């Protein structure tokens, strides 16, 4: 050990005194996350409250940590939870295993699963870190109805995915607007326009429920 070695160590300590601290006074002050931060998952809903999850289990197959468990079930005319033939009756995410990689989000064909800005997942109970469907479902927004209930946006599953996201919802259209339209149904024309815009990469996602947490609606 040389004579000047201790002074070199003091120099490193002295230089760090002028650097911006990287720690936060948590939980009094919380660090703002990036807009596309990979936090806790959320199961999204359609504008009428039906669930977007169709119980296909692709997210569970894509998970490299085997953290997702899904059980699908069939919808009936008396009990409908999603527009499709099936829905996710059981949905669990084990955050003791989850690595928050986002591969499940990419695998989801209906945009039912997204990731929020919520990162507060610490707990003193292993059981409480296995989130159930009720914990992951997005809260009901204005105009939504808790399932089960019939389809409100159309008569088939296709109406939910080809409709214009920027168009008013059926229960938002006034009698005056219907009269001005001459009573004609232009849903076919709107659907064709939506398909053309999505093909051109100009699609809108205004109908997605904003994720929980610090951020508002997440860019997609």
UniProtKB/Swiss-Prot annotation:
Positions contributing to [4Fe-4S] cluster 1 binding: 53, 56, 59, 108
Protein source organism: Frankia alni (strain DSM 45986 / CECT 9034 / ACN14a)
MF GO annotations: 4 iron, 4 sulfur cluster binding; iron ion binding; NADH:ubiquinone reductase (non-electrogenic) activity; quinone binding
Main location per the UniProt record: membrane
Gene3D superfamilies for this protein: 3.30.70.3270
Residue ranges annotated for the 4Fe-4S ferredoxin-type domain, each copy included: 43-73, 89-118
Cofactor notes: Binds 2 [4Fe-4S] clusters per subunit.
Bilayer topology: Peripheral membrane protein
GO BP field: aerobic respiration
Keywords of this entry: 4Fe-4S, Cell membrane, Iron, Iron-sulfur, Membrane, Metal-binding, NAD, Quinone, Repeat, Translocase, Ubiquinone
EC number: 7.1.1.-
Gene Ontology CC entries for this record: plasma membrane
Family: Belongs to the complex I 23 kDa subunit family.
Protein's recorded name: NADH-quinone oxidoreductase subunit I
Residue positions binding [4Fe-4S] cluster 2: 63, 98, 101, 104
Positions with biased composition (Basic and acidic residues): 187-220
């Amino acid at each position: 050990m040389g004579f000047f070695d201790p002074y070199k160590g003091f120099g490193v300590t002295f230089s760090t005194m002028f650097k911006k601290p990287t720690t936060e006074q948590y939980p009094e002050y919380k660090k703002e996350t990036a807009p596309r931060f990979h936090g806790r998952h959320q199961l999204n809903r359609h504008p009428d409250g039906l669930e977007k999850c169709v119980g296909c289990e692709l997210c569970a197959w894509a998970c490299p940590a085997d953290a997702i468990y899904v059980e699908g079930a069939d919808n009936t005319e008396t009990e409908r939870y999603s527009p499709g033939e099936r829905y996710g009756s059981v949905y669990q995410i084990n955050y003791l295993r989850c690595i928050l990689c986002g591969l499940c989000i990419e695998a989801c064909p209906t945009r039912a699963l997204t990731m929020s800005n919520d990162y507060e997942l610490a707990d003193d109970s292993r059981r409480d870190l296995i989130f159930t469907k009720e914990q992951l479902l997005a809260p009901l927004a204005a105009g939504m109805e808790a399932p089960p209930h019939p389809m409100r946006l159309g008569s088939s599953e296709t109406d939910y995915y080809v409709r214009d996201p920027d168009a008013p919802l059926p229960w938002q259209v006034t009698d005056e607007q219907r009269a001005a339209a001459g009573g004609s149904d232009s849903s076919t024309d709107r659907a064709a326009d939506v398909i053309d815009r999505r093909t051109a990469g100009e699609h809108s996602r205004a109908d997605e429920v904003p994720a929980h947490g610090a951020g508002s609606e997440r860019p997609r």
